[in-house]
Amino acid sequence: LFKELIKKFDNIDFEKIKNKVETKKIIFICGMPRSGTTLVEQILSSHPEVYGAGELLYLENSINKNFLENNIINRQKIIDLQSSSSENVFLDYFKCFDIYNLDKNIITDKTPQNFKWIGFIKIFFPNAKIILCQRNPKDNCVSLFKNDFPALTMNWSFDQEEIAEYYNEYHKLISFWKDKIPKDIYQLNYER
């Protein structure tokens, strides 16, 4: 999937995407699992204007439903995103917070795996901030191996070789996003 994302988003010009008027600001906190996303969200949500929403699955579910078929991305649908379908996802995402009756203006979504969807994030939410949590690769991979994650979503985390392969593909994808939209990604190093 990572190579597929790079291939499909390579020719997208994110500078041409119109900014939407957002009633609430959103900060996406992402990175490899066990890279510090929870800690970053806890620090940010201690501010009175920030609501820490935790790991939301809405974005990934919406992308899987509307843009992926057997882990293959429909490029035409990405191109069409600049039409009303993008607006619908944008509005629906914020509607999921209506049940909370929030008086806070900033919302965080700390789903680590959202690093895969940074291209979609910049189309759906051009004004969103993205914090990419980075950790020493060896420490991150050992921590992944020592934890018991759900096999359905992270079956690669049970084997050291698969973890290394996944991390390498992650690193290539992150390098692509940072080259493609450098001013929109803030990299936060766990050890600093």
In which residue ranges do the predicted regions lie?
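PAPS-dependent sulfotransferase catalytic domain
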Residues: 53, 58-80, 100-192
